[in-house]
Amino acid sequence: MDYFEIITLKDGLKCCIRNGVERDAQAALDHFLLTHGQTNYLLTYPDEPGFSIPQECQYLKEKRNSKREIEIVAIIDRKIAGMAGINTVGSTEKTRHRAEFGISIDKKYWGLGLGWKMTKVCIACARAANYQQLEL
């Protein structure tokens, strides 16, 4: 799935929302560590095992080439301010209508409408991929 949009946040900052690509791998991992240390409401803590840079590159490449999954990044001042995505739950008849949604926003950008916009983008992508159920 492909996505690209330039938006203006509530404070007037310009933000580019686009697919994450392989060259974003290090910045994506840095964003993971940052945001997972800013709140207890994400799935893991920053010190729990995550992806290596090659694994993150592969993950972003797979999402970019997928027809039913996506990983988007929000870029502000050349840095990742947020990430969000949808991943299929399964490929069996009983699960292929379901997708998981995940999102993380740098606390510096909370309250500016970025999370709302990225959530709307992921919901639209899920609908386009014919998912009937989106799970947080």
Language model segments and positions:
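Short acidic N-proximal helix/loop "leader" segments that mark the beginning
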Residues: 1-11
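A short beta-loop-alpha structural element at the N-terminal edge
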Residues: 15-28
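An amphipathic alpha-helix signature
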Residues: 25-33, 53, 57
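Helix-loop element at the rim of GNAT/NAT acetyltransferase active sites that forms part
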Residues: 30-47
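Acetyl-CoA-dependent GNAT
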Residues: 49-97, 102-106
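Conserved acetyl-CoA pyrophosphate-binding loop and the N-cap/start of the following alpha-helix
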Residues: 109, 113-121
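Conserved GNAT acetyl-CoA-binding A-motif
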Residues: 119, 126-136
